[in-house]
Curated annotation (Swiss-Prot):
GO terms for molecular function: bent DNA binding; DNA binding; identical protein binding; unfolded protein binding. Induction: In late stationary phase, by phosphate-starvation conditions. SMART domains: DnaJ. It comes from the Bacteria. It comes from Escherichia coli (strain K12). It is found in: Cytoplasm, Nucleoid. The keyword Chaperone applies. GO terms for biological process: chaperone cofactor-dependent protein refolding; protein refolding. Pfam families: DnaJ, DnaJ_C. The lineage of its organism: Bacteria, Pseudomonadati, Pseudomonadota, Gammaproteobacteria, Enterobacterales. DNA-binding protein that preferentially recognizes a curved DNA sequence. It is probably a functional analog of DnaJ; displays overlapping activities with DnaJ, but functions under different conditions, probably acting as a molecular chaperone in an adaptive response to environmental stresses other than heat shock. Lacks autonomous chaperone activity; binds native substrates and targets them for recognition by DnaK. Its activity is inhibited by the binding of CbpM. It binds to curved DNA in a sequence-nonspecific fashion. The gene is cbpA. This is Curved DNA-binding protein.
Length: 306
């Protein structure tokens, strides 16, 4: 056997960090992948790169490889490592080779530790009305399975029935313990995180825990006052428009906003004065009478003043 120069195979230096080595591995793996590369030795080069990555991507295994590389010219190393057949070992033989050269204690000390699985995040769309009460939801996602090189080898479909609590907010994260990818060497599974996305509503805008709704009113309703029916998340209510209301005025309806464990928000009705269509002759005459009666009123009196 002969000890390969894994750093040369990857085109990196022994002092390079894992990020640099990982970048080199991905580049070479794409270059020599048998399904992509046209080079005659692509398959052999791909296996060689994968073998180098398996060793250099593991901190303990890389340290042991560096130690073996430093001793490659020592007589004792040559007696135990070389068999004269000119073949190189692969990463699967690494434990046995290292322990035969440096002793059983070294092998025991490099046992790979238990590693926690990866977390997974998925976005869950929730309608505003659904935030008022706890509800059940069936979610589906793909559980990635990683190979020895840290790359996704396959994805396994998975379905869960979950409870979405009342009062969830936009961007809130819900943890489902142990529903992520499996751990390695007895390590715990990762978690699944549900990231809540409140779907846009055709009527309501969210402002913190409060809701805003634009309420169209006629000029005479704004001037004289009125009672208009306004929807909320639960039911419709009768909203009082005070006389002399202005466009853009906000009327507060207490306790009709979003509900959470800590507080209940309010609903703000934002008035929008809507003019009727182009008036006929009789209607125009009435508008003119109103204009004459309010001739002293100048809506632009303070316009542009600090």
């Amino acid at each position: 056997m002969e000890l390969k120069d894994y750093y040369a195979i990857m085109g990196v230096k022994p002092t390079d960090d894992l990020k640099t080595i990982k970048t080199a591995y991905r580049r070479l793996a794409r270059k020599y992948h048998p399904d992509v590369s046209k080079e005659p030795d692509a398959e052999a080069r791909f296996k060689e790169v994968a073998e180098a990555w398996e060793v250099l991507s593991d901190e303990q295994r890389r340290a042991e490889y560096d130690q073996m590389w430093q001793h490659r010219n020592d007589p004792q190393f040559n007696r135990q490592f070389h068999h004269g057949d000119g073949q190189s070992f692969n990463a699967e033989d690494f434990d046995d080779i290292f322990s035969s050269i440096f002793g059983q204690h070294a092998r025991q000390s490099r046992q790979r530790p238990a590693t926690r699985g990866h977390d997974i995040e998925i976005e869950v769309a929730v309608f505003l009305e659904e935030t008022l009460t706890e509800h059940k939801r069936t979610i589906s996602y793909n559980l990635p399975v990683y190979n020895a090189f840290g790359m996704i080898e396959q994805e396994i479909p998975k379905t869960l029935n979950v409870k979405i609590p009342a009062g969830v907010g936009n961007g809130q994260r819900i943890r489902l313990k142990g529903q992520g990818t499996p751990g390695e060497n007895g390590g715990p599974n990762g978690d699944l995180w549900l990231v809540i996305h409140i779907a846009p509503h055709p009527l309501f805008d969210i402002v913190g825990q409060d809701l805003e709704i634009v309420v169209p009113v006629s000029p005479w309703e704004a001037a004289l006052g009125a009672k208009v029916t306004v929807p909320t998340l639960k039911e419709s209510i009768l909203l009082t428009i005070p006389p002399g209301s202005q466009a853009g005025q906000r009327l507060r309806v207490k306790g009709k906003g979003l509900v959470s464990k800590k507080q209940t928000g309010d609903l703000y009705a934002v008035l929008k004065i809507v003019m009727p269509p182009k008036p006929d002759e009789n209607t125009a005459a009435l508008w003119q009478q109103l204009a004459d009666a309010q001739s002293s009123f100048d809506p632009r009196k303070d316009w542009g003043k600090a």
